[in-house]
A protein has these predicted regions:
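Amphipathic alpha-helical linker/stalk segments
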Residues: 40, 74-104
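C-terminal peripheral helix-coil segments that are non-catalytic and often amphipathic
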Residues: 1-14, 101-109, 144-160, 179, ...
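Generic hydrophobic, amphipathic alpha-helix propensity
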Residues: 23-34, 51, 76-80, 84, ...
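Amphipathic alpha-helical segments used for helix-helix packing
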Residues: 73, 113-134
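Helix-turn-helix
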Residues: 2, 29, 33-71, 75
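Amphipathic alpha-helical packing segments from all-alpha helical-bundle domains
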Residues: 85, 89-90, 97-101, 133-159, ...
């Protein structure tokens, strides 16, 4: 039977410095487990031992990919940002139906946990912004990418004449993201998605022609 060290070695980088397919899967499993635990609980209360147990990973595997908990947190921030931005980019926000479908998806995701955990990216920012400058910068970059994805869809709507006259798409993207964050926070503390639904529905009513 292979030892933990041998299993970790089998997942290490190839000669070009890239992770092997097995290594990518193992690292991804660890990051996903850490992201779930930190979202359901908090960054502070999530321990390395918790992550190992949730991911089914050994110490040698985890420390092969992450030097310490700080490095793991950085990977979690990137994971949450990549997931959110990818979903937003694929949502087809350039049409009214696509924007409404995205609204429904956001509400459905929040409803599954009755708002618990709040925004997967925003909650990390709230926990880390005052104590970890690097993490704060990472979260800010994630929000910037998210805003860019929203802006792209709103620009398509504007070009198609589907937005009411008023603020430009760049300003609307920031407004939508801020409304979304506020709605998710209220849904979290009230354990009810109605504030989120109200925020998004009001925004869509005000902007769509």
């Amino acid at each position: 039977m292979a030892s933990n060290g041998e299993r970790a070695a089998g997942a290490r980088a190839d000669g070009a410095g890239r992770l092997t397919a097995k290594g990518e899967r193992t690292r991804g499993r660890i990051v996903a487990a850490a992201a779930r635990l930190m979202h359901e609980g908090s960054v502070t209360e999530t321990t390395i031992e918790d992550v190992k147990a949730a991911a089914g990973a050994s110490s040698s595997q985890l420390y092969h990919y992450f030097a310490d908990k700080e490095a793991l947190v950085q990977a979690v921030i990137d994971h949450q940002a990549d997931t959110i931005v990818g979903t937003t980019e694929q949502a087809g926000l350039g049409t009214p139906d696509g924007l409404r479908a995205w609204r429904d998806l956001v509400v459905a995701q929040a409803a599954r946990s009755s708002g618990q955990g709040g925004c997967p990216l925003g909650s990390l920012g709230g926990q880390l912004a005052e104590t970890d400058a690097r993490a704060r910068g990472q979260v800010a970059d994630g929000f910037g990418r998210w805003s860019d994805a929203l802006r792209a869809g709103l620009r398509e709507l504007a070009a198609a004449g589907r937005l009411r006259p008023g603020p430009d798409p760049d300003a609307l993207a920031v407004t939508l993201l801020a409304s979304l964050q506020g709605g998710l926070l209220l849904a979290q503390v009230e354990r009810d998605t109605r504030p989120l639904e109200t925020a998004l529905d009001t925004f869509l009513t005000l902007i769509l022609a």
